[in-house]
């Protein structure tokens, strides 16, 4: 059955760009890869080869692809920043009816990259895994053209400026379009064998699920249809489409793990009913049909996971949780301990450590964005895998032996101390994670480059132009000017929160500084220039991380004091008597401002005097997004310093000026 369109609405809403995309889809050849894309393919091959060396049979095909910036519609809505990181095969390999509503120029580029990645995997004898959100939002113009397919509203209302909807998977037309997209995907990428889908988060969701962010909602037609029928029917459609295309696939649907304040996607009764309707090879929430056994397939690769010190790159350290809990994970780089999604990567690493057996064992190893971290993990696994199931003493001895291969036997204890201290720092930072604190603060809220001034609302549009468009802020300027309003989460708000935040930072920084001291000892004792350069770079990256810790502390403290002072509404004395001293709160704010200026200048010097990468930056300005810092960061840090220095006199409008 072909879709029927609402033609007047369609003609009114389709943009010229969409029209061009449709024409291009019919006539344009396969995309020609840029030199940047070619270099990224070479990086993918190096990582995939490394994964194979470690025993991988599968690698994620979707990790590290260029993001779909065309989905920032309208341009000032930050919410797409969450879902564009996970490629949607429905938009990349669309049925003909869908083509006019997606950017086919972008799509051809990504399809070409995926095909080339598959050729690499074919050459290496590896298979592919696909990770995405599903069912993902569609552009509003699509639903205007096909109103019968509009499913639930799935955006987070406090983080989006636009109501965003996914498709209703109960509609036969939706199932047909998804089946066609699946067949198209597997025709281009035949190496894919396994799928993991996140749902109920980041622009995805099913009708009438209790956990939908705007509240339970959906298409009226399916309100009374059992959830088990709807979810199982959709997933079985995808598996059947793959079979019709000549492929046997496995699917694992993963609802977001609810935090304390969130509802579960499916009730226990709903989950049981869904699982019993699934065939083998399909799982929901890690339970495979039809009997609910633990899913035996490959786990998800999490594109969001960046590591406790992100946006700093290259700070790879072993995961030492086994030292305290007896768990078997061995590497931490690239993993966010506060996130339940991290468990997928840990499982892949545990699989990678397992000794080879005569039977066929499938292993997936994630291709993390940071190549240096992945190489470190590989060396660690290869060096210590023999002790992975040994006693704590055995494992510590193996770790010390690995440290000797990294820094030399004389410096092995120094390096072991570095790892212990950074592991402690990482663990303490967990307390502040509502999502990785450094990522949420410095990237989503641009603490790293935005100024701390008493009256941020008075900054001009030109003053804010370098950071304001990249704040994850869907509300107004009042919220955008608040340093701790991070995507409508004010978890660090108030003086009490300031003290708790400060307590965590004051325990983390000494560990980081202690690790830096050990790194400098290792550097000074290094036997040659190459080794000295390696440890010098590690030290500079650690210095940059310490700068970000200080900035985070300053931002939270500054906003707490600023809110307190403004709420008191005490009018400054216009003519203070001789002998008037500086008030404690004025001294607090101005000292915080000066500390942050000096701290930012330190970070700027580090960036200016280091040729290698310290911070993850987009390669070109056009690829800076809410989720990634841009290559202009050094200039932006200078701009931050200049703006803060230009507003010293503003403090006299908040406080009585001292007159000693």
In which residue ranges do the predicted regions lie?
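Catalytic-core regions of glycoside hydrolase
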Residues: 28-157, 162-423, 447-448, 452, ...
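Positively charged n-region of N-terminal signal peptides that target proteins for export
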Residues: 1-5
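Bacterial N-terminal signal peptides
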Residues: 6-16
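Boundary at the C-terminal end of the N-terminal hydrophobic targeting segment
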Residues: 19-23
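Catalytic domains of carbohydrate-active enzymes that cleave complex glycans
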Residues: 386, 390-660
């Amino acid at each position: 059955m072909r879709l029927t369109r609402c033609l007047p609405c369609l003609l009114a809403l389709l943009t010229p760009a969409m029209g061009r995309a449709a024409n291009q889809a019919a006539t344009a050849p396969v995309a020609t890869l840029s030199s940047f894309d070619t270099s990224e393919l070479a990086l993918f091959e190096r990582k995939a080869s490394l994964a194979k060396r470690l025993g991988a049979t599968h690698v994620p095909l979707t990790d590290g692809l260029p993001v779909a910036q065309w989905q920032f519609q309208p341009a000032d809505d930050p919410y797409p920043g969450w879902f564009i990181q996970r490629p949607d095969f429905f938009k990349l390999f669309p049925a003909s009816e869908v083509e006019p509503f997606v950017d086919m120029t972008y799509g051809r580029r990504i399809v070409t990259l995926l095909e080339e990645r598959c050729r690499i995997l074919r050459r290496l004898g590896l298979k592919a895994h696909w990770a995405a959100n599903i069912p993902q939002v569609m552009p509003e113009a699509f639903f205007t053209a096909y109103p019968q397919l509009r499913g639930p509203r799935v955006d987070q209302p406090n983080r989006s400026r636009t109501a965003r909807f996914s498709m209703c998977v109960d509609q036969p037309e939706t199932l047909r379009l998804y089946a066609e997209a699946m067949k198209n995907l597997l025709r281009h990428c035949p190496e894919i064998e396994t799928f993991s889908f996140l749902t109920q988060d980041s622009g995805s969701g099913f009708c009438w699920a209790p956990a939908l962010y705007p509240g339970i909602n959906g298409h009226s037609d399916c309100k009374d249809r059992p959830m088990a029928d709807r979810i199982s029917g959709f997933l079985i459609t995808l598996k059947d489409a793959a079979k019709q295309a000549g492929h046997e696939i496995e699917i694992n649907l993963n609802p977001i793990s609810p935090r304390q304040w969130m509802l579960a996607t499916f009730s226990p009764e709903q989950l049981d009913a869904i699982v019993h309707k699934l065939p083998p090879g399909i799982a929901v929430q890690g339970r495979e049909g039809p009997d609910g056994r633990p899913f035996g397939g490959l786990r998800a690769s999490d594109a969001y996971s960046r590591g406790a010190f992100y946006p700093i790159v290259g700070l790879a350290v072993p995961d030492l949780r086994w030292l305290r809990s007896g768990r078997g994970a061995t590497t931490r780089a690239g993993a966010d301990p506060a996130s339940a999604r991290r468990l997928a990567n840990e499982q892949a690493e545990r699989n990678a450590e397992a000794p080879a057996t005569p039977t066929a064992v499938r292993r997936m190893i994630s291709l993390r964005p940071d190549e240096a971290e992945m190489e470190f993990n590989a060396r660690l696994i290869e060096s210590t895998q023999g002790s992975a199931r040994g006693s704590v003493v055995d494992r510590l001895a193996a770790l010390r032996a690995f440290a000797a291969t990294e820094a030399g036997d004389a410096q092995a204890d120094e390096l072991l101390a570095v790892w212990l201290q950074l592991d402690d720092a990482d663990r303490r930072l967990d307390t502040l994670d509502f999502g990785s604190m450094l990522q949420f603060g410095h990237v989503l809220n641009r603490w790293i480059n935005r100024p701390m001034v008493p009256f941020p609302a008075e900054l001009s549009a030109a003053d804010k132009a370098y950071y304001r468009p990249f704040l994850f802020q869907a509300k107004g300027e009042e919220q955008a000017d608040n340093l701790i309003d991070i995507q409508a989460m004010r978890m660090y708000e108030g003086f009490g929160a300031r003290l708790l935040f400060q307590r965590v930072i004051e325990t983390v920084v000494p560990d980081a500084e202690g690790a830096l001291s050990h790194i400098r000892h290792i550097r000074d004792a290094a036997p040659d220039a190459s080794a000295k350069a390696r440890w010098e770079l590690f030290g500079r990256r650690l210095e940059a991380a310490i700068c970000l810790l200080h900035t985070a502390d300053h931002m939270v403290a500054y906003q707490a004091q600023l809110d307190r002072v403004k709420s008191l509404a005490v009018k400054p004395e216009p003519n203070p008597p001789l002998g008037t001293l500086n008030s404690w709160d004025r001294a607090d704010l101005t000292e915080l401002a000066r500390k942050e200026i000096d701290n930012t200048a330190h970070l700027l010097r580090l960036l200016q005097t280091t040729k290698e990468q310290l911070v993850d930056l987009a390669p070109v300005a056009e690829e800076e997004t809410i989720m990634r810092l841009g290559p202009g960061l050094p200039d932006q840090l200078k701009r931050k310093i200049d703006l803060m220095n230009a507003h010293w006199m503003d403090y006299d409008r908040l406080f009585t000026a001292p007159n000693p």
